């Protein structure tokens, strides 16, 4: 049976727990997986669950170190050079600035995929890795599928024409929430849309099961990369409002990111230094312990100035499964996570007073917190069970791998767009 390959920008990556979960879910169902990492992994904590992963991780060399012509001549395939020419002609109109280096990656990956016995490639995010997968297939390599998330479809810089081509060339393209599907309806043509399938990310419900612990009083937990779209500055404003009311609320913010200095400065400006702890990046076992000791979870996500946003924040899924009452915003797929407000509290984005009121109301009402805890756990069991989601995805991969064994399996067209 051909192998399944994941083509990722970096692996492992602390902030991409959903990818590790997905890989473990596929292996649990018997998939034979190889991971191709396009860049070296960052020096950061590792999730303990990584030790369970059996898949080999193949580190690709930097594209500037790849000799595409040497690879081409080494292949000895008379059809390869014409395919390269056709791919270059077809994609030249998009003017992708890194196209030459991505083509070099695809040529190298063609050989590596054959050596690894790869029959299908899956890429997360419709960014450079997806284009490499598309080129790989156009050069005679295995077919591919995609998972579309948020930055790859919402940012102002997204090229809708190229996105349409990548999705249309895929065996199928997953996206992680219904809100994304609706957004894609306005971006993609009929052929590409026919390949889009909604599948929620799944989490390990046994790992995140509530343990019956009573959370610390007035302890708000928030987790995410320290970037604009997570809404941490709004959360700090809300906490400052609660502090001015004389409440003894405290908060732990878990994560690292480009806005750390900005957030640290704002903590000091608002007089929250004794109340807010920036814990940095932490592995999943430590995060789980924090979830079980907090009173509630808050993540006031927002749409960034560049259009970027969260689609289906994994930490909200985890908090929900752990029975931690959640406060968030109606951005993208978050209402789907919180069941339209039945499994958590939704407040307007960028609204610190509304966020403060929601936090205060929950901190003052243990019975409501208990109701939301039960409702959140039940909703996670219905919609975000890793075992269930893995089965669905496994079936799609099996179909793609079976199609790969058929000589008539199609390839992306190598004609230029009109």
Report residues per predicted region:
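Conserved donor-binding/catalytic core segment of Leloir-type glycosyltransferases
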Residues: 212-240, 252, 297
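Short hydrophobic beta-strand element within catalytic cores of glycosyltransferases
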Residues: 316, 321-328
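Nucleotide-activated donor-binding/catalytic signature segment of Leloir-type glycosyltransferases, i.e.
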Residues: 264-285
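Carbohydrate-associated surface elements
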Residues: 179, 202
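Acidic donor-binding loop of glycosyltransferase active sites
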Residues: 275, 292-307, 324
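Conserved acidic donor-binding segment of nucleotide-sugar-dependent glycosyltransferases
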Residues: 340-341, 345-352, 361-367
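N-terminal subdomain of nucleotide-sugar transferases
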Residues: 1-64, 114, 142, 168, ...
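A short, well-ordered alpha-helix in the C-terminal region of glycosyltransferases
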Residues: 275, 354, 361, 368-383, ...
């Amino acid at each position: 049976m051909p192998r399944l390959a994941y083509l990722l920008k970096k692996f492992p990556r602390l902030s991409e727990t959903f990818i590790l979960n997905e890989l473990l879910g596929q292996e649990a169902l018997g998939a034979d997986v190889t991971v191709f990492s396009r860049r070296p992994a960052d020096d950061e904590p590792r999730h303990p669950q990584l030790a369970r992963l059996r898949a080999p991780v193949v580190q690709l060399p930097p594209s500037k170190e790849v000799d595409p012509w040497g690879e081409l001549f080494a292949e000895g395939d008379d059809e390869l050079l014409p395919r390269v020419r056709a791919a270059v002609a077809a994609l030249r109109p998009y003017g992708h600035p890194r196209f030459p280096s991505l083509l070099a990656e695809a040529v190298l990956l063609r050989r590596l995929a054959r050596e690894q016995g790869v029959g299908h490639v899956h890429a997360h995010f419709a960014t450079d890795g997806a284009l490499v997968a598309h080129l790989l297939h156009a050069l005679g390599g295995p077919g591919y599928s995609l998972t579309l998330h948020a930055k790859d479809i919402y940012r102002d810089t997204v090229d809708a024409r190229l996105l349409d081509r990548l999705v249309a060339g895929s065996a199928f393209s997953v996206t992680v929430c219904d809100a994304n599907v609706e957004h894609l309806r306005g971006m993609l043509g009929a052929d590409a849309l026919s390949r889009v399938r909604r599948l929620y990310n799944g989490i390990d419900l046994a790992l995140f099961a509530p343990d019956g612990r009573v959370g610390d009083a007035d302890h708000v937990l928030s987790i995410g990369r320290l970037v604009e779209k997570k809404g941490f500055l709004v959360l700090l404003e809300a906490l400052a409002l609660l502090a001015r009311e004389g409440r003894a609320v405290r908060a732990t913010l878990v994560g690292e990111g480009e806005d750390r200095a900005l957030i640290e400065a704002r903590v000091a400006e608002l007089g929250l230094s004794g109340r807010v702890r920036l814990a940095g990046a932490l592995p999943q076992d430590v995060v789980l312990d924090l979830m079980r000791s907090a009173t509630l979870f808050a993540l006031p996500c927002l749409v960034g100035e560049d259009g970027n946003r969260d689609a289906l924040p994994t930490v909200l899924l985890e908090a929900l499964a752990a029975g931690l009452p959640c406060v968030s915003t109606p951005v993208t797929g978050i209402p789907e996570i919180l069941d339209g407000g039945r499994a958590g509290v939704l407040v307007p984005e960028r609204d610190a007073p509304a966020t403060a009121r929601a936090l205060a109301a929950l901190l003052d009402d243990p019975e409501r917190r208990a109701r939301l805890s039960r409702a959140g756990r039940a909703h996670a069991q219905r919609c975000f069970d890793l075992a269930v989601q893995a089965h669905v995805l496994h079936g799609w991969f099996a179909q793609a791998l079976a199609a790969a064994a058929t000589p008539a399996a199609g390839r992306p067209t190598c004609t230029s767009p009109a």
